[in-house]
């Protein structure tokens, strides 16, 4: 949790919301208030957990702070079926993977021909993809996603 006091941020949150929905493609992986994808963190209250500087860093250098629960995995089953996606859980003998189509696969490790854990983010860097102004607007939008104090 960022835990610090709220700060004023530059940028236009309304423009940031449009970027989130459209050009950024964020909804394919991230969820806000129950709408969106499952393969990335839920951003419903991201403004409570990240500072504006952290949000910007997450957008331009997504590999810097990837938590293990967001690691990905590529496997090939002994029947030749390849599967790649988010590593949902992994034990000594089994692994479960959520693929890009939100299908959950479960494998016994002894049945895998190949297995590779990928400890980088599946999120692309938006450095060079979004302008500085667009990044500022997107950060303003994301930083405004906070817990409803009345709820």
Each model region followed by its residue ranges:
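C-terminal capping alpha-helices of c-type cytochrome domains
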Residues: 1-4, 9, 60, 81-83, ...
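Accessory interdomain/linker segments of ATP-dependent helicases and helicase-like nucleic-acid enzymes
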Residues: 3, 32-35
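Sequence/structural segment immediately N-terminal to covalent heme-attachment motifs in c-type
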Residues: 8-32
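Solvent-exposed, polar/charged alpha-helical surfaces in well-ordered, non-transmembrane soluble domains
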Residues: 14-18, 53, 57, 133-136, ...
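Short, solvent-exposed loop/turn and secondary-structure capping segments
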Residues: 31, 39-42, 150-151
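Gly/Gly-Pro-rich "capping" loops immediately C-terminal to redox-active cysteine motifs
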Residues: 35-61, 71-125
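Active-site phosphate-binding and catalytic loops of NTP-dependent enzymes
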Residues: 65-68
């Amino acid at each position: 949790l960022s835990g610090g006091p709220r700060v004023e941020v530059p940028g236009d949150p309304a423009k940031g919301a449009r970027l989130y929905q459209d050009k950024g493609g964020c909804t394919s992986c991230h969820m806000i208030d129950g709408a969106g994808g499952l393969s990335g963190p839920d951003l419903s209250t991201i403004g409570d957990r990240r500072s504006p500087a952290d949000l910007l860093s997450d957008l331009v250098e997504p590999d810097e702070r990837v938590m293990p629960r967001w690691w990905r995995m590529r496997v090939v089953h002994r029947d030749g079926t390849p599967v790649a996606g988010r590593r949902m859980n992994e034990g000594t003998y089994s692994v479960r993977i959520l693929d890009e189509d939100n299908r959950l696969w479960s494998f016994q490790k002894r049945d895998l021909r190949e297995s590779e854990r990928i400890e980088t983010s599946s999120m692309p860097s938006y450095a060079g993809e979004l302008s500085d102004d667009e990044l500022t607007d997107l950060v303003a939008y994301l930083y405004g996603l906070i817990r409803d104090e009345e709820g």
